[in-house]
């Protein structure tokens, strides 16, 4: 018995790709625009409901195509309103996505890979190793699935998602070919229509890919720094051995020079590890290292996970660290932890690739006092 033909998942196309596909099947490109409105603005995945497409086209699409996002395996709500979604992929793997509501926004923390290859020692995701990259449909499908589950609205003030942070499982710059089209859809007015300042990509420092990113799309940038010197960063963020701090920061400055989304500043993420990177001397060193890179700094209280060798810095140590940075005129925010009672806080996202006791999620990243980030 012959295998069932694989259907084309329309979530894998950004607007340019969808127009090209419609042209290839003999349809006018404007049909792609209509399709995008149905999928992303109306949340419709059933071609029969797309009533402004003629019946012949609907039948053709049903035979050849599908609109398929990852399914919800389970979801958990936290006491602060945060919801963690475990989404099941083709092949049975799972990734976790976190929705963080706040008074004036709702942020979604999105994964780019199953697992992560970067081996950051303080991150639970890194302990599971790397499995595979997510496809465009699996990345934008996280946004679509959560948005349609929470409830789409034509009222911009009631949007289920106002901000997206690429801070979930994985290193986004190691999956650039799928992350960029997915972010295109986040920004596209026919899809989710988010401002480029409300879509943030976080990287641990894949410098060549960062240069490529700047040539392909303009979104807000956050960097996972976590150490003020190469010796320590080599230990806790091993990609630093390939792209040391000064090389990384030079790449950041090149990106900022091309970008309007960042308003001239990068967000520097720094997880506070007790007795490791949180001394006042290290704060002085960090301020000096960042002197030539316009930035705002998010200090992230470490979120422990089972088997972690680290502990969280005390509030008093974090406050002292922040005051030293502020004395240099740097903008400093101590990130507010969200969703930690459901393992949905920064550094706790793992998914289903490994033992569930290692599960990890990430936190919130915002331009003010709240942030979501899943450490790489």
UniProtKB/Swiss-Prot annotation:
Belongs to the radical SAM superfamily. RlmN family. The keyword Iron applies. NCBIfam families: PRK11194.1, rRNA_mod_RlmN. Residues 102-341 form the Radical SAM core domain. It catalyses: adenosine(2503) in 23S rRNA + 2 reduced [2Fe-2S]-[ferredoxin] + 2 S-adenosyl-L-methionine = 2-methyladenosine(2503) in 23S rRNA + 5'-deoxyadenosine + L-methionine + 2 oxidized [2Fe-2S]-[ferredoxin] + S-adenosyl-L-homocysteine; adenosine(37) in tRNA + 2 reduced [2Fe-2S]-[ferredoxin] + 2 S-adenosyl-L-methionine = 2-methyladenosine(37) in tRNA + 5'-deoxyadenosine + L-methionine + 2 oxidized [2Fe-2S]-[ferredoxin] + S-adenosyl-L-homocysteine. Pfam families: Radical_SAM, RlmN_N. One of its GO terms (biological process) is rRNA base methylation. It comes from Pseudoalteromonas atlantica (strain T6c / ATCC BAA-1087). Its EC number is 2.1.1.192. Binds 1 [4Fe-4S] cluster. The cluster is coordinated with 3 cysteines and an exchangeable S-adenosyl-L-methionine. The active site is at 96 (proton acceptor), 346 (s-methylcysteine intermediate). PANTHER family: 23S RRNA METHYLTRANSFERASE, RADICAL SAM CORE DOMAIN-CONTAINING PROTEIN. This is Dual-specificity RNA methyltransferase RlmN. One of its GO terms (molecular function) is metal ion binding. GO terms for cellular component: cytoplasm. [4Fe-4S] cluster binds at residues 116, 120, 123. Reaction proceeds by a ping-pong mechanism involving intermediate methylation of a conserved cysteine residue. InterPro entries: Aldolase_TIM, Methyltransferase_A, RlmN_N, RNA_MTrfase_RlmN, rRNA_lsu_MTrfase_RlmN/Cfr, rSAM. S-adenosyl-L-methionine binds at residues 170-171, 202, 224-226, 303. Keywords: 4Fe-4S, Cytoplasm, Disulfide bond, Iron, Iron-sulfur, Metal-binding, Methyltransferase, rRNA processing, S-adenosyl-L-methionine, Transferase, tRNA processing. It comes from the Bacteria. It is found in: Cytoplasm. Disulfide bonds join 109-346. Its cofactor is [4Fe-4S] cluster.
């Amino acid at each position: 018995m012959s295998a069932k033909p694989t259907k084309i998942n329309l979530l894998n196309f950004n607007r340019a790709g969808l127009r090209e596909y419609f042209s290839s099947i003999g349809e006018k490109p404007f049909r792609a625009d209509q399709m995008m409105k149905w999928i992303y603005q109306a949340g419709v995945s059933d071609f029969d409901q797309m009533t402004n497409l003629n019946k012949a086209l609907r039948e053709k699409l049903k035979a050849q195509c599908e609109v398929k996002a990852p399914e919800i395996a389970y979801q958990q709500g936290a006491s602060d309103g945060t919801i963690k979604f475990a989404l099941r992929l083709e092949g049975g793997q799972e990734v976790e996505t976190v929705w963080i509501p706040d008074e004036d926004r709702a942020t979604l923390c999105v994964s780019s890979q199953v697992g992560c290859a970067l081996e950051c020692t303080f991150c639970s995701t890194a302990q599971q190793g790397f499995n595979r990259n997510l496809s465009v449909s699996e990345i934008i499908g996280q946004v679509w699935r959560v948005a349609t589950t929470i409830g789409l609205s034509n009222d911009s003030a009631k949007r289920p998602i106002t901000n997206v942070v690429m801070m979930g499982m994985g290193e986004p710059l190691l999956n650039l070919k799928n992350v960029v089209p997915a972010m295109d859809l986040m920004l596209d007015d026919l899809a989710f229509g988010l401002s480029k300042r409300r879509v943030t990509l976080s990287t641990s420092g894949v410098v060549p890919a960062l240069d490529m990113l700047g040539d392909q799309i303009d979104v807000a940038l956050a960097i996972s720094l976590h150490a003020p010197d190469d010796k320590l960063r080599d230990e806790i963020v091993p990609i630093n051995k390939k792209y040391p701090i000064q090389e990384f920061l030079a790449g950041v400055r090149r990106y900022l020079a091309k970008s309007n989304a960042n308003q001239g500043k990068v967000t520097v993420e720094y997880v506070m590890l007790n007795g490791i990177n949180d001394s006042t001397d290290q704060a002085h060193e960090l301020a000096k290292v960042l002197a030539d890179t316009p930035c705002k700094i998010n200090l992230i209280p470490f979120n422990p996970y089972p088997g972690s060798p680290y502990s969280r810095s005390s509030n008093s140590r974090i406050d002292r660290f922040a005051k030293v940075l502020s004395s240099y005129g740097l903008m400093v925010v101590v990130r507010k932890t969200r969703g930690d009672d459901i393992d949905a806080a920064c550094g706790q996202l793992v998914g289903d690739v490994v033992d569930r006791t290692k599960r990890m999620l990430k936190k919130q990243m915002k331009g003010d006092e709240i942030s979501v980030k899943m450490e790489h």
